[in-house]
């Protein structure tokens, strides 16, 4: 009986491993996928662009931050079209590079940089930063979930602004399944370190998976040295964990906050964040 149980357990483990390998493909190094029109390129870690133009619109900078739930809801496209209107920058998490999503990027004349954290059934998944203009540079970063072993991703980008400054942007999907906060803090601290050599304006935003008070404290401590301010939303319908704590955040520096809203949407398991800034003189 015991031998049969052991054999059954071994079979289940082997089946789970094989299924994981069939469904998920994890690259050896962080990869960044860039789509400009219908042209798609893949690079290891970083990509730089020459002749980047100003991202803002006459000093106005409007952005959408949204965990889009791998476009699993039927109305993702219509809602994304609605929320991306008049935006110069879209910071999405859990974006899946399906054919329909690629076509949406082409139709909107967007330039996108995605971290290919892993592929699920052939479609790349990870954070993606989408803009009306090319960045100066973009670099991919990944951190593995301690239990699931699938990477969470972050993208560091720099964009030119019309006032002569450059904007540093970090789009993050933070590690989720941990007992303590060690891995969580390590991921955010490593990203915050990227900002130490940047003297201009900053946006640090995404799905921080901040579902406990310990994580909230770790998040704020990790970002303290960059002197970032947290955006307050009105209305604030940010998706909350059962603890009542919001999961998504936007931090900034060197910009003037104009308004910030977190409306409701049934197109994802997260609600979108809509934020408007103006450049400082």
Curated annotation (Swiss-Prot):
Family: Belongs to the UPF0294 family.
The name this protein goes by in its record: UPF0294 protein VP2298
Assigned keywords, A-Z: Cytoplasm
Subcellular location: Cytoplasm
Keyword Cytoplasm: yes
Pfam families: Exo_endo_phos
SUPFAM superfamilies associated with the record: DNase I-like
Organism: Vibrio parahaemolyticus serotype O3:K6 (strain RIMD 2210633)
GO molecular function terms listed in the Swiss-Prot or TrEMBL record: catalytic activity
Highest taxon, organism lineage: Bacteria
Chief location bin: cytoplasm
Cellular component terms per the entry's GO annotation: cytoplasm
